[in-house]
Structures are given as C-alpha cells and as structure tokens.
A protein has these predicted regions:
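Helical mechanochemical/support elements of P-loop NTPase systems and associated helical scaffolds
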Residues: 3, 68-71, 96, 134-137, ...
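Nucleotide-state-sensitive switch-loop elements of NTP-binding domains
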Residues: 2-13, 17-131
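C-terminal accessory "lid"/substrate-recognition subdomains
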Residues: 147, 155-297, 307-312, 316-331
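Short, hinge-like loop/turn segments at secondary-structure boundaries
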Residues: 50-53, 106-107, 136-138, 166-168, ...
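Alpha-helical scaffold elements adjacent to nucleotide-binding pockets in ATP/GTP-utilizing enzyme cores
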Residues: 78, 99-103, 141-144, 163-167
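Flexible active-site lid/hinge loop adjacent to a nucleotide/diphosphate
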Residues: 128, 132-144, 150
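Conserved beta-strand/loop subsegment of P-loop NTPase cores
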Residues: 33-34, 88, 113-123, 142-153, ...
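Flexible loop/N-cap segments at domain edges
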Residues: 303-304
C-alpha cells in the first residue's frame, strides 16, 4: 500500500525545494512518486524535479483541488498503478486542501493508499501580510495540516519571529511546529499519522486559462514552433508562462538581471544557457539560483503577480535575451 503525504504551503513557501530535499534523502530501496500541481499553465516544477529520480505527474494550469475536473484522479490513479512506496502530493500554493484530502480519505482509495501526515510550509513573514491573513486558502492550508513547517528561518527578522509565536499560541492545539531553512526536514516526519482533522469550508474559485485545459501534462511546443506563452488568472492572481524550444539559448547574466529587477511577485524557471541549465526561483526579494551541466529539453519561465502586468513588454525583454534562437514564428 502506498504511503501518501500532502505538502501544502502558499506561494513562495518553499514546497519544491522541500520536495527536492526529501527526494535526495529517500531510502535507496524505495520508489517514490510525485503528483504536482501549479497555478500556471507551463509546468515549471516538473522541470525543476526532473533529475530527482522519482516518477512524476504534473497537473498544470489551475487547481488540483478541482477534483470534479478529473485530472487529479487520473494523475493519482496512474501513479498508484505503479505501486510506489511513497507518493508526495504538492498542490498549487493557491489551492485549497479540502477536496484533495476528502478524495484521499474516501473509500475508493482505501485499498490503495494510506494517508499519512499532511505538512504545510509557512514563511512566517507572510503572517504580517494583511492580504494573506484574509486569504481563505492561506488560512485553511495551515488549518488542515498535521505538521507546520516554518521554513526560511534564516530570513526572519524579529517581527516575523514574533508573528510566528503569536500565531502558534492562537491555535490552541498541540500540533508539531518545525523550524528550518531551505526545506531541510527529516524524512521521518512523513511517517507521522494523519491525526489533525478539522472542518474546512468549500473553496470558491474560478480559473480563466488562456487555452483549453491541458489535463495532466504540461504544455508542449508543436513541431517547428519556436516559443509560446500561456496565461491564467484566479483569486486576484495572474500568471504568464513561456516555453522556448531547445534552439533558444539565453544570456546568463542578462537573464539573472531580468529576474532580479522585474517587479513581479513570483518568478520560476528552468532555462537553457551556454553552461547547461539555469534554475530560477524568486519570491519577492528572495532569489535562489542553481546551475546544472545538463541542458533542458526546452526552456520554461513562469511569472505570477497580484495584478495584471504588461506581458508583452516582459516577453519582448525575454526574447531579446536569447543569444541563439529558433526563428520560426509562433502562432
């Protein structure tokens, strides 16, 4: 029977970094799988986790919690048929956990999986953000968790530490609170039982993708297509993502400057550069970069903002950063 953990957390809390750490620490004799959902249409996390050795299914473009749309169940069924020892499920940071947990706890899957501890990653600096305090998904991700992981502790100032202590006292329960940085948690916590149950409200949201729902596969380029972009919006957040063919190679320094200076809430990417692959993960002013020698099959960049941005201007800047390029026009 497959052991399952749901790992939630709002945008920029460090879920993908935590997954990479857990996968690096997994027992060598075990087979692990990942079911990941992203708010954007492009599918960045699949590229960032591609070298993890785990079997991976992506549900891009919206919300895994929309289980009536079937992609969640299809992806889950496909992975369970391979009988992995453990399945880690990462919903989008804008997702609501209720429908996912309800599905996993249903009789339909009782013979296939054991739901273990649900973890919620928290950047305590977000506790001082009034907009997030009023966001039901932010609140309910925390409310549904068995274990709270206060991540990015190395970035906290006194106000963030105070907010974390006040929040913990206000909960009035004895749930485990882990403090860490860079998602470095002991994999043994995954074996904790699912014990914290609370009644959560139903989520209310509506996705507006720029293209038909892509199901359980990230967007791909058509033969001969140099690049394409896709848009999505929900709950007052807007995403724009681009895919570039393997013919496009980006200027490393110029791209890093674009990532650092562009006034957006969130930027993630796995991009082909002369040196191989540049992995980018920026939330606010927090920026993580990683280079890999092996180039990616294509380049993917996704941005998220809390207001609609000038996507055409951002796109023009990106296109200008290519030092080699596929000239076939996109449609």
């Amino acid at each position: 029977m497959t052991r399952v953990n749901v790992i939630t957390g709002f945008l920029g809390s460090g879920k993908t970094t935590t997954l990479r750490h857990l996968l690096a620490c997994k027992p060598t004799q075990e087979r692990w799988a990942i079911l990941v959902n992203e708010f954007g249409e492009i599918g960045i996390d699949g590229a960032l986790l591609a070298d993890s050795g785990a079997q991976l299914k992506e549900i891009p473009g919206g919300c895994m919690c929309c289980v009536n749309g079937l992609p969640m169940q299809i992806g889950l069924n496909m992975l369970l048929k391979t009988q992995p020892d453990r399945l880690l499920i990462e919903p989008t940071g804008l997702g609501h956990p209720k429908q996912i947990l309800r599905l996993l706890e249903s009789n339909v899957y009782s013979a296939w999986l054991t739901l273990q501890a649900t973890l919620c990653l928290l950047d305590a600096r977000q506790l001082n953000d009034e907009r997030l305090q009023n966001n039901e998904n932010f609140r309910d991700q925390l409310a549904a968790a068995d274990i709270i992981v206060a991540n990015k502790m190395d970035t906290y100032d006194g106000d963030a530490c105070d907010a974390l202590r006040h929040w913990q006292l206000a909960q009035g329960d004895e749930r485990t609170l882990l403090e860490t940085q860079h998602g470095q948690i002991d994999p043994a916590w995954l074996d904790r039982p699912r014990t914290h149950t609370t009644t959560l409200p139903d989520a209310h949201h509506h996705h507006t993708p720029s293209a038909p729902v892509s199901g359980i596969a990230a967007l791909r380029l058509r033969p001969g297509q140099g690049w394409r972009r896709a848009l999505n919006q929900d709950q007052g957040y807007f995403s724009c993502g681009w895919i570039f063919s393997e013919e496009s190679v980006f200027d490393t320094i110029g791209l890093l400057e674009w990532v650092r200076l562009t006034p957006l809430l969130r930027i993630k990417g796995a991009v082909r550069i002369v040196e191989g692959t540049l992995c980018i993960n920026r939330q606010g002013t927090d920026l993580q970069i990683e280079t890999r020698q092996t180039p990616p099959p294509d380049s993917r960049i996704e941005v998220i903002h809390d207001a609609e941005a000038d996507w055409n201007a951002l796109q023009s800047a990106l296109l200008a950063l290519r030092i080699r390029r596929q000239e076939t026009p996109t449609i």
